[in-house]
C-alpha cells in the first residue's frame, strides 16, 4: 500500500554515470531524506515501485563550505541510498522525469 510518508522518504533518483554503471549489478541509487532509516527506505521502495529489495546501503555526503560575494555559506548534507534489488527485479528511473 502506498503511504504518503513513502513520498517523503524517497526524494529523487540519482542519475549519474556511476549510478547507471551499478544498474548492471541490479542496484539503483536514490537521494533520500536525511533522517530516513534503512528499513524505512526499503519499505518505501517496495511500496512505490512494486519490487522486492534485497539490501540497502546508505551514504551521507557532507555539505561543502562555499563563498558567495565574500559571504561564507554551507551546502546541506545529502543522504544517498544504494538499493540492491532481488534477482529478476528492475526499476526504470529514466521514465517519468
Curated annotation (Swiss-Prot):
Molecular function via GO: rRNA binding; structural constituent of ribosome
Keyword annotations: Ribonucleoprotein, Ribosomal protein, RNA-binding, rRNA-binding
Disulphide-bonded residues: none
Keyword ATP-binding part of the UniProt annotation: no
A Pfam entry, by short name: Ribosomal_L23
InterPro entries, per the entry: Nucleotide-bd_a/b_plait_sf (IPR012677), Ribosomal_uL23-like (IPR013025), Ribosomal_uL23/eL15/eS24_sf (IPR012678)
Domain of life: Bacteria
Signal peptide location: none
Any Gene Ontology CC annotation: ribonucleoprotein complex
DNA repair listed as a keyword: no
GO biological process: translation
Membrane-crossing segments per the record: none
Main function: One of the early assembly proteins it binds 23S rRNA. One of the proteins that surrounds the polypeptide exit tunnel on the outside of the ribosome. Forms the main docking site for trigger factor binding to the ribosome.
Record-linked NCBIfam families: PRK05738.1-3, PRK05738.1-5, PRK05738.2-4
Similarity section: Belongs to the universal ribosomal protein uL23 family.
Subunit architecture: Part of the 50S ribosomal subunit. Contacts protein L29, and trigger factor when it is bound to the ribosome.
HAMAP family in UniProt: Ribosomal_uL23_B
Protein name: Large ribosomal subunit protein uL23
Amino acid at each position: 500500500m502506498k503511504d504518503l510518508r513513502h513520498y517523503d522518504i524517497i526524494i529523487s533518483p540519482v542519475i549519474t554515470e556511476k549510478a547507471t554503471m551499478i544498474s548492471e549489478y541490479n542496484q539503483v541509487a536514490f537521494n533520500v531524506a536525511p533522517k530516513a532509516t534503512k528499513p524505512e527506505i526499503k519499505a518505501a521502495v517496495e511500496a512505490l515501485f512494486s519490487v522486492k529489495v534485497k539490501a540497502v546501503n546508505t551514504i551521507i555526503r557532507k555539505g561543502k563550505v562555499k563563498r558567495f560575494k565574500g559571504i561564507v555559506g554551507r551546502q546541506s548534507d545529502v543522504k544517498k541510498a544504494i538499493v540492491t534489488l532481488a534477482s529478476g527485479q528492475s526499476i526504470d528511473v529514466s521514465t517519468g522525469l
